[in-house]
């Protein structure tokens, strides 16, 4: 796990990508820019096990993964896990509109295209975590 330097109010993020260099790159960006502790998964099976056992504030998920693939991981997370409502941000080289639309229909909350633009990634993750933590308001 890669931990944020500031220990106050850290967020837990699961990063799923089959390329170790990409996992580490994403984790470093988030640890240095946001208060994030990153858990890294290199396989779909590992991602499903982690998502099934631990709650996260956000999940970054690559689509093109060996094994069952990113779409199936997304569907399983949305079907039954402690992360059923956790924001899932797709991180992929596939950047066409049809792929983005398919991801949103499958339950993704946001999409960041590779190559990663640091500011875009940080803004997207920050917005998704903030949106999840907004208190619900009730009418009187």
Task: Label each residue range with its predicted role.
Residues 65:
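Receiver (REC) domain active-site loop signature in two-component systems and cognate sites
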Residues 98, 116-125:
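C-terminal output helix
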Residues 20-39:
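Two-component/phosphorelay signaling modules centered on CheY-like receiver
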Residues 55-57, 81-87:
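His-Asp phosphorelay/catalytic-motif detector in bacterial-type signaling
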């Amino acid at each position: 796990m890669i931990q944020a330097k500031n220990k106050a109010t850290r967020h837990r993020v699961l990063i799923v990508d089959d390329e170790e260099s990409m996992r580490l790159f994403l984790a470093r960006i988030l640890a240095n820019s946001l208060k994030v502790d990153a858990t890294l998964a290199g396989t779909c099976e590992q991602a499903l096990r982690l998502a099934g056992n631990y709650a996260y504030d956000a999940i970054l998920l690559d689509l093109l993964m060996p094994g069952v693939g990113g779409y199936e991981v997304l569907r399983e997370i949305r079907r039954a896990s402690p992360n059923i409502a956790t924001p899932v941000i797709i991180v992929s080289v596939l950047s066409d509109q049809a792929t983005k639309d398919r991801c949103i229909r499958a339950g993704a909350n946001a999409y960041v295209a590779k190559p990663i633009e640091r500011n875009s990634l940080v803004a997207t993750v920050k917005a998704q975590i903030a949106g999840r933590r907004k208190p619900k308001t009730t009418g009187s």
